[in-house]
């Protein structure tokens, strides 16, 4: 188990382009100054019990992946550890995260075992769903990792996302945008009601929506204060609409390099491992997604 004073980052890799992008992102990410990294390479394909054989790369030994991974990470961490294990990838990553007491896990969006027609690899999905710490999922190699967008909704996981960002070391030029999306309350079948009642209900609904927006503004300012104290430049935004749609639109408008979401929102069921906004972000976001819990 890692010492509590350390911030351990675990990187899972299988040598795929997506995994190499995750390694590059891990080396660029603004982790705390005391961060250490450990990478794990699994010998087995996801769901297989025999040593891995990958289409098109059967002559690439696992030891070469270990060497390349260590070399890439050594640019930031000269003492980076890379472990080769005989386990399916998701199991290897989750086991290592528990053993090391990882503060964060970094994985590629889809590895060698995935099919091109699948939206997201089974390994990254399983890691995101079952890891006890935040998971950074990387689709392609980023050029910069300075602009963050964090979606908040009042949930415990959203607050944990803000706290996680406050632990990072803000990079030069680093900025964070905090966005809260309020789904407006509307009237259904109001046209069937008498005019006087319809007008009263509309005023009440308008007042309710205004109250919810005011609360959202207070919530984002509270989160912004926490990040400003940690050294981040912060902007806030409260939007009205469907949460995932507005979150992705804000990410595009702000040119975010990283999208940060809670694993499950305020309305998520406790038995659900991953909420709809987190799932949608992982599926549709072109930039790395950090799922916090």
How does the language model describe each region?
Residues 22-25, 92, 161, 219, ...:
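Well-ordered alpha-helical segments embedded in enzymatic catalytic cores
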Residues 84-92, 238-246:
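Charged docking surfaces used in two-component/phosphorelay signaling
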Residues 1-7, 23, 28-32, 94-143, ...:
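Gly/Ser-rich helix-loop-strand patches that form or flank binding pockets
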Residues 221-225, 243-252:
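A short, acidic, amphipathic alpha-helical segment used as a generic capping/interface helix at domain edges
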Residues 55, 59-70, 213-221:
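Short, surface-exposed alpha-helical segments at coil->helix boundaries
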Residues 205-212:
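Structural signature of PLP-dependent enzymes
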Residues 67-79:
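Phosphate/nucleotide-donor binding subsite
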Residues 2-59, 76-80, 143-203, 226-230, ...:
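Small/aliphatic-rich secondary-structure junction motif
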């Amino acid at each position: 188990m890692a010492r509590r004073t350390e911030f351990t980052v675990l990187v899972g890799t299988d040598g795929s382009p997506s995994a190499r992008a995750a390694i590059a992102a891990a080396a660029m990410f603004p982790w705390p100054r005391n961060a250490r990294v450990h990478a794990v390479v699994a010998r087995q394909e996801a769901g297989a019990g025999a040593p891995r054989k990958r289409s098109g790369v059967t002559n690439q030994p696992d030891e070469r992946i270990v060497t390349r991974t260590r070399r890439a990470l050594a640019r930031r961490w000269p003492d980076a550890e890379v472990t080769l294990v005989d386990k399916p990838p998701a199991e290897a990553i989750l086991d290592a995260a528990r053993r090391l007491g990882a503060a964060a896990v970094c994985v590629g969006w889809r590895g060698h075992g995935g099919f091109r027609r699948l939206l997201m690899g089974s390994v990254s999905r399983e890691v995101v769903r079952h890891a006890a710490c935040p998971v950074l999922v990387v689709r392609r190699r980023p050029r910069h990792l300075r602009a963050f967008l964090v979606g908040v909704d009042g949930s415990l996981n959203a607050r944990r996302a803000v706290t996680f960002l406050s632990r990072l070391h803000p990079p030069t030029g680093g900025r964070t945008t905090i966005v809260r999306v309020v789904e407006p309350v509307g009237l259904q079948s109001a046209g069937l009601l008498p005019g006087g009642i319809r007008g009263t209900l509309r005023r009440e609904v308008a007042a309710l929506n205004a109250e919810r927006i005011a609360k959202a503004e207070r919530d984002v300012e509270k989160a912004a204060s926490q990040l400003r104290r940690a050294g981040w430049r912060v902007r806030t935004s409260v939007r009205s609409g469907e949460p995932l749609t507005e979150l992705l639109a804000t990410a595009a408008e702000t040119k975010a390099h990283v999208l940060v979401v809670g694993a499950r929102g305020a309305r998520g069921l406790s038995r659900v491992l991953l909420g709809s906004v987190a799932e949608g972000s992982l599926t549709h976001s072109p930039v790395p997604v950090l799922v916090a819990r």
